[in-house]
Structures are given as structure tokens and as C-alpha cells.
């Protein structure tokens, strides 16, 4: 792709997301979503092949359907209230349709079907954009309309997402699909706490993006897309392979790694609101997610066939501008737990 064309498309995608996040008018929100959608399709299809075309088509159809539902909710709300302001959504029908549209855009269950398939069909860089940047705009709208949202629908979707995110990743050997199911589960945790403490949702999103960014950067550095290819890199780049596995355990929420912080804080916040069954169910379902990360770590590092290796091992990162942030991201993705007392200001 021509660099000028690619820069223009990327700028349009970024502008679309920024417009959604900064707008208080429903029409501008819808325009921002459409700008972002039309610009992100060529980015997903940057490596032009049949699988990328199929994945991009699935993504386009799903997001277009969600945009149609979004506009329907906006029109229904406008007919009943006469308001275009985001925060003024009082009609229950409009609220339910809006919740469904945003759930579909985020890839939450039961509209999660597109996330693993689309992520698997595109490159690692496109997958990183899909699972991080593309979550910001819908989550920002959920954050703004949290007081008037359909709570029952949102909590049901959150619980189903945590369950599906753990259950779906159990038999996967493709690392991109594993990351996709992990994303579904994390989105479930974020939406579960949204109506109780929206600020905590944003903190969870920040930690999730940081860990996902680190994982994808290491996978790109290692050129690994399957569990088999990851295990084959152990003799060549043991440091990078070890870091990938540690950060994946952090994504699973294993203490004392950074990924444990949001789960701990969310469970604590839910119990403060006299909710016992919900956090207990979430904690039990999160064990499925942690299990497949532990199994991946075990099969990759502890069940290797003993062999003599005459290759030179790479114990240092190659110098490159793209990887200059990587050491900082690795530290933050694994060692944030000592900052936990500082985060008590959210309570």
C-alpha cells in the first residue's frame, strides 16, 4: 500500500475514534463510528489474501449491523425526548437497542461470533489494532451513558462473555484466537463493573491495552502465530518466549502479576455493593481463562523433548525504533502490583 494512502487511511481511523470520544451529540457519534469503520477495513486487508478479505467482510457486516441498530436507537430516543444529547437517553426501548449495538461493536457475548474469526484471518499488527484501538470508541459511549443503560442486559452479556472467553480458548492452538477469546473475557470484566464504578472500567481498559500491546509486540518480534511455532522458538530466543508466557499469565490474572489487579479491584467493588453471587461466579469462570494460559505455558516450556542445541541464543533485544517501548511495557505488564495501595483512591 502506498505510504501516503496508508497514512491518510490511518489518520481517518484515528479521527473517527477521537470524534466518537469527544462528541456529546448522537449524530457526530454515528459519523465518527462510520469514519472509523470505512478507514479500518483497508488496514485489516493490508496483507491482501482470501482470508484477510473474508475477515474484513465479516467485520464490515457486523459493524454495519451494529451501526444500523445504533441509528435506530438514536431515532427512537429523538422521537420520545427530542434530544440529541448523549447523556439524555430515558426511553427503555432505545436504551435496550443502544446496549445491543454497543455490545455487538465490542464483541461481547452473545454477539462475540466475529471476534475470533476476524482476528485469526488478519495479520498480528491488524489484530493488535482490532483488539485494542477499536474497543475505545464503543467503551467511551458505554462510559457516558452508564446511568441510563439497560443493566440486566449488560450484566447478562458480561457474565456470558467471561464464560465464553474462558470456554472458547480451551482447545485453541492459534495464538491470535487465544488473544481474541481473552479480549472477550476482559471486555466482560469491564462491562460488569461499568455501572458501579466507571472509573475502574477505564483503569481496567488501560491495563488490558498495555498487556495486549506487549503480547502482540513480542509475538511479532518472535514471528509466532501458533502454540507449536512458539514452542519452536524456545531454543532460539528463550528470553522473548519466556516473556510472552509470563505476560500471557498476567492476562489470565495470575497473582502477583499486573493482570491480577483489575480482577481483584472489581471483585472488591462488587462485594462492597452487597453483590456476592456475581463476583463469585465471575471468579470461578475466570479460572477457565487462567487454565488455558497455564496449559499453554506448561506445554511450551516444560514438556520439550531434551535435545542438544548448537545455535547461538539471543539474550538481548535487537535495536529498533519499533521496540524501544517494549522494556517499559514488559515491566508495567508484570510488576504493577506494588502500585495497588496508590490505586485505592478509586474506592
UniProtKB/Swiss-Prot annotation:
Listed name of the protein: NADH-ubiquinone oxidoreductase chain 2
Quaternary context: Core subunit of respiratory chain NADH dehydrogenase (Complex I) which is composed of 45 different subunits. Interacts with TMEM242.
Principal EC category: translocase
Membrane association type: Multi-pass membrane protein
GO cellular component, one term: mitochondrial inner membrane
Compartments where found: Mitochondrion inner membrane
Keyword Electron transport: yes
Amino acid at each position: 500500500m502506498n505510504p501516503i494512502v496508508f497514512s491518510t487511511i490511518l489518520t481517518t481511523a484515528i479521527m473517527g475514534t477521537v470524534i466518537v470520544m469527544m462528541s456529546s451529540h448522537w449524530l457526530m457519534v454515528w459519523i465518527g463510528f462510520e469514519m472509523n469503520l470505512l478507514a479500518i477495513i483497508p488496514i485489516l486487508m493490508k496483507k491482501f489474501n482470501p482470508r484477510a478479505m473474508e475477515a474484513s467482510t465479516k467485520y464490515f457486516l457486523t459493524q454495519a449491523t451494529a451501526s444500523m441498530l445504533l441509528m435506530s436507537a438514536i431515532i427512537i430516543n429523538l422521537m420520545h425526548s427530542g434530544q440529541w444529547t448523549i447523556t439524555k437517553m430515558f426511553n427503555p426501548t432505545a436504551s435496550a437497542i443502544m446496549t445491543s449495538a454497543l455490545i455487538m461493536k465490542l464483541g461481547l457475548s452473545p454477539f462475540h461470533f466475529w471476534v475470533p474469526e476476524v482476528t485469526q484471518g488478519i495479520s498480528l499488527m491488524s489484530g493488535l489494532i482490532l483488539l485494542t484501538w477499536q474497543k475505545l470508541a464503543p467503551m467511551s459511549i458505554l462510559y457516558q451513558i452508564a446511568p441510563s443503560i439497560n443493566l440486566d442486559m449488560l450484566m447478562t452479556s458480561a457474565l456470558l462473555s467471561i464464560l465464553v472467553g474462558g470456554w472458547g480458548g480451551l482447545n485453541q492452538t492459534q495464538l491470535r484466537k487465544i488473544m481474541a477469546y481473552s479480549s472477550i473475557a476482559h471486555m466482560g470484566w469491564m462491562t460488569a463493573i461499568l455501572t458501579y464504578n466507571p472509573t475502574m472500567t477505564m483503569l481496567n481498559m488501560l491495563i488490558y491495552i498495555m498487556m495486549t500491546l506487549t503480547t502482540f509486540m513480542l509475538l511479532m518480534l518472535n514471528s509466532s502465530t501458533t502454540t507449536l511455532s512458539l514452542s519452536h522458538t524456545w531454543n532460539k530466543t528463550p528470553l522473548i518466549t519466556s516473556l510472552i508466557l509470563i505476560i500471557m499469565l498476567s492476562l489470565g490474572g495470575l497473582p502477583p502479576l499486573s493482570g491480577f489487579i483489575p480482577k481483584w479491584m472489581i471483585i472488591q467493588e462488587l462485594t462492597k455493593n452487597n453483590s456476592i453471587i456475581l463476583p463469585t461466579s465471575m471468579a470461578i469462570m475466570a479460572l477457565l481463562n487462567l487454565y488455558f494460559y497455564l496449559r499453554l505455558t506448561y506445554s511450551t516450556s516444560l514438556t520439550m523433548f531434551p535435545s542438544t542445541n548448537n545455535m547461538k541464543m539471543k539474550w538481548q533485544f535487537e535495536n529498533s525504533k519499533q521496540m524501544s517501548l517494549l522494556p517499559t511495557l514488559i515491566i508495567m505488564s508484570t510488576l504493577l502490583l506494588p502500585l495497588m495501595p496508590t490505586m485505592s483512591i478509586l474506592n
